[in-house]
Amino acid sequence: MESQSQRGQHETPKRSRFTGMFHKLKTNLVFRSKLAEINGAMGDLGTYIPIVLALTLAKDLDLGTTLIFTGIYNAITGAVYGVPMPVQPMKSIAAVAISSTAEDFGIPEIMAAGICTGGILFVLGISGLMQLVFNIIPLSVVRGIQLSQGLAFAMSAVKYIRKEQNFSKSKSVGDRPWLGLDGLVLALVCVLFIVLVNGDGEEEEEEEEGDGSRGRGRWGSVRKVIANVPSALLIFLLGVVLAFIRKPSIVHDIKFGPSKMKIVRISRKAWRNGFLKGTVPQLPLSVLNSVVAVCKLSYDLFPEKEFSAASVSMTVGLMNMVGCWFGAMPTCHGAGGLAGQYKFGGRSGGCVALLGVAKLVLGLVLGGSLVGILEKFPVGVLGALLLFAGVELAMAARDMNTKGDAFVMLMCTSVSLGSNAAIGFVAGDLLYVVLWMRNYGRAKPSSLPPQSGEHA
């Protein structure tokens, strides 16, 4: 009897750990508001669709396999982190692939670059070095990277709206006509519709109606109804409908069933080119935007959610060390995607988990034939979604309200936009140290930002 009771006592912690884990997963996936979470899931598509489409058209990326794996990534990260953690393409690797010939940088090189980047990020995470990096980077430098990335997204969005795009060559091909199913008027209407529904993105508190405020209360009710309209979801569905109208024969091109998965064969030359041309430029961007900036922005938006930079680095690493072997696009998290999903209503892991299920279903049911629909999706509509994701990310820098903070941030932003995020990061850190040395010993030194680790 004693041995049985002792076994029961030993088993209790196991059950409690399992129960606690199940409760955490359930809590992470619970919708805060069903319609808002569904709407928020659309907030990342302005970045996701153009890059996936470009790689599919230019490099014959397996769209069906990419949808399946990114869908799984979305579902897992949503359950683990409990925030609308995005899954985005690795932009630097994609840019190199699109601008190179298939012989010079094709699918094997793309996957080699993704595996190498993922492997390094996983090692940085599991060793604790990523957490150390996160703790010592000045907050103003993080804000500078976020501001530069947000402005870069917004400028790309304006280009999508104003100019017609050839994604397979990653370039503009002329001015967008005012009228038409992918015209300038349509894009501008989408932008104004989002502003009307979502406003500036601030959470509005409900006002109590007092005596004599019936008119104001009536307008408040109308405004509340408008605010509950799923703007991003409606705009995305409009884009899908317009894609079929622009090319009705898409219906005949649809083939049911998933793509056949196969392991990508990577030669020694592909490993070398993938690492030198893909991993080397991608790694600084992944460390800064996919890990450091994401963790900082997540803390700003969801201070009650705790997860480390090390864990985020490891999830990015695992995603690519698994999926890239099967031809799935190299992916990472991104502060811009998180900002976009938050802008349109994403508040929980259920938001991206739902998006993941949708991707998984599309990948299994339609496979690569979905590319025909994406090819005719109005680019101006994507630009409208991407514009607000970029602006939302850039607005994270609004808390740099002293001259010392703003100076470091804006210098980092300027260098990042003029060159790249890695050089901007080095310039920002160097400037921070120089200013700290200059102000050392002053009775009232000019304000410099706290370390990002103080907020982790």
From Swiss-Prot:
Free-text disruption phenotype from the record: 90% and 80% reduction in molybdate content in shoots and roots respectively. Reduced growth of roots and shoots under conditions of limited molybdate supply. 9-fold reduction in molybdate content in leaf vacuoles. Decreased nitrate reductase activity due to a reduced molybdate uptake.
Compartment(s): Cell membrane; Endomembrane system; Mitochondrion membrane
GO cellular component, one term: mitochondrial membrane
One GO term (biological process): molybdate ion transport
Effect of D429V: In strain: cv. Landsberg erecta
Transmembrane parts of this sequence: 67-87, 110-130, 133-153, 177-197, 225-245, 309-329, 354-374, 377-397, 417-437
Entries under Pfam families matching the protein: MFS_MOT1 (PF16983)
InterPro entries: MOT1/MOT2
Keyword Disulfide bond: no
Miscellaneous section: The amino-acid substitution Asp-429 to Val observed in cv. Landsberg erecta may decrease the molybdate transport activity. A 54-bp deletion in the promoter of MOT1 is strongly associated with the decreased expression of the gene and the resulting low molybdate content observed in several cultivars.
Protein name per the record: Molybdate transporter 1
Source species of the chain: Arabidopsis thaliana (Mouse-ear cress)
